[in-house]
Amino acid sequence: TTTTGFSSTQYQNWPICSQMILFILSFIGGCAGSAGGGPKVIRIAVIFKLGGTSIRKRLHPNAVTRIKIGGDSLSSDTVSSIAGFIGLYLVTFAVGCFLISLTGKDLITVCSSCILTLGNIGIGLGGIGMDFSFSIYPDWAMWIFSFLMLVGRLELFTVFALFTRDFWRS
């Protein structure tokens, strides 16, 4: 499945484990610089390295650790910004899922719909797969999906900055 929703195979007929892998990959998104949505592979790599560094700091509290990508050390501000982005992405996904769950659809359909729109990807599971559409949702849910698509495509910090007082003051 592509970011345009074009699909070349009936992935909904695949085993559940394979569908789960697709769902997890939906959270990763494309590579840096790609048109695909999601947090991007580089941010996920930094988060995994941050997790490893945190474990090492627990074992060796006095150790000085650095997170490196491609041989270059990342500043603590950069790592903090990436962690904040991932946290905000997950909170946005969770709030979207909660709001869409009010439609009464099943959990797989709700979660798949939210990550599909937030990540701007084409993989829909449950009631919105290849043979189904978003017409199963009421009109108010479409507004939430539209917001998730906008946030996912324009980047979280950019859109949420519009809702801060500081943005409008300066």
Language model features by range: what are they?
Residues T1-S170:
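Membrane-proximal intracellular helices of multi-pass ion channels
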